[in-house]
């Protein structure tokens, strides 16, 4: 049996925060604002996984009103989500992600993001795809006000 899930996340770019996407710290003059480390890609992946097993979203599991998640490492949050997926008897079939950002360029960091995510989801590198695009200077991402990410996951019964 297969289950599919879709995730989407967006965070505002601000000064004074590190930029962490896909578990990679990217050198840039701005970072993403959020209660946790605001890793927009890992949040989208977590939401996709939760959606695939019908378990809500990351806001339900890791509320921003709970101080224990303040500045939390999103990789640890995704690891907890993956434990829920495994408890339901599923494993990764494949994952496809898109980062939407005008700047900075993501290409130099994509392979490390893929490796990080494959490790977190206990999968092979060939099961994970990460790509990036711009909005051609349109909208909030085009104006460099924020970064968005989308993820689609396919899970299969073990």
Curated annotation (Swiss-Prot):
EC number(s) recorded for this UniProt protein: 4.6.1.12
Catalytic activity: 4-CDP-2-C-methyl-D-erythritol 2-phosphate = 2-C-methyl-D-erythritol 2,4-cyclic diphosphate + CMP
TM annotation in the entry: none
Keywords: Isoprene biosynthesis, Lyase, Metal-binding
Residue positions binding 4-CDP-2-C-methyl-D-erythritol 2-phosphate: 9-11, 35-36, 57-59, 62-66, 101-107, 133-136, 140, 143
Domain of life: Bacteria
Metal-binding found in the keyword field: yes
Pathway: Isoprenoid biosynthesis; isopentenyl diphosphate biosynthesis via DXP pathway; isopentenyl diphosphate from 1-deoxy-D-xylulose 5-phosphate: step 4/6
Co-factor(s): a divalent metal cation
Cofactor binding, per record: Binds 1 divalent metal cation per subunit.
Role, per record: Involved in the biosynthesis of isopentenyl diphosphate (IPP) and dimethylallyl diphosphate (DMAPP), two major building blocks of isoprenoid compounds. Catalyzes the conversion of 4-diphosphocytidyl-2-C-methyl-D-erythritol 2-phosphate (CDP-ME2P) to 2-C-methyl-D-erythritol 2,4-cyclodiphosphate (ME-CPP) with a corresponding release of cytidine 5-monophosphate (CMP).
PANTHER family: 2-C-METHYL-D-ERYTHRITOL 2,4-CYCLODIPHOSPHATE SYNTHASE, CHLOROPLASTIC
Protein name as catalogued: 2-C-methyl-D-erythritol 2,4-cyclodiphosphate synthase
Lineage: Bacteria, Bacillati, Bacillota, Bacilli, Bacillales
């Amino acid at each position: 049996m297969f289950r599919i899930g879709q995730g989407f996340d967006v965070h505002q770019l601000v000064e004074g925060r590190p930029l962490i996407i896909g578990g990679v710290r990217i050198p840039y003059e701005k970072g993403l604002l959020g209660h946790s480390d605001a890793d927009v890609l890992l949040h989208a992946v977590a939401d996709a996984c939760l959606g695939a097993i019908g378990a809500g979203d990351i806001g339900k599991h890791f509320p921003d009103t709970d101080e224990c998640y303040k500045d939390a490492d999103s990789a640890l949050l995704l690891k907890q989500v993956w434990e829920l997926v495994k408890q339901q008897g599923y494993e990764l079939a494949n994952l496809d992600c898109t980062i939407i950002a005008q700047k900075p360029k993501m290409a130099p960091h994509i392979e490390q993001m893929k490796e990080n995510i494959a490790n977190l989801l206990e999968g092979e590198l060939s099961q994970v795809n990460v790509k990036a695009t711009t909005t051609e200077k349109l909208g909030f991402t085009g104006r460099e006000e924020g970064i968005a990410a989308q993820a689609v996951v396919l899970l299969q019964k073990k």
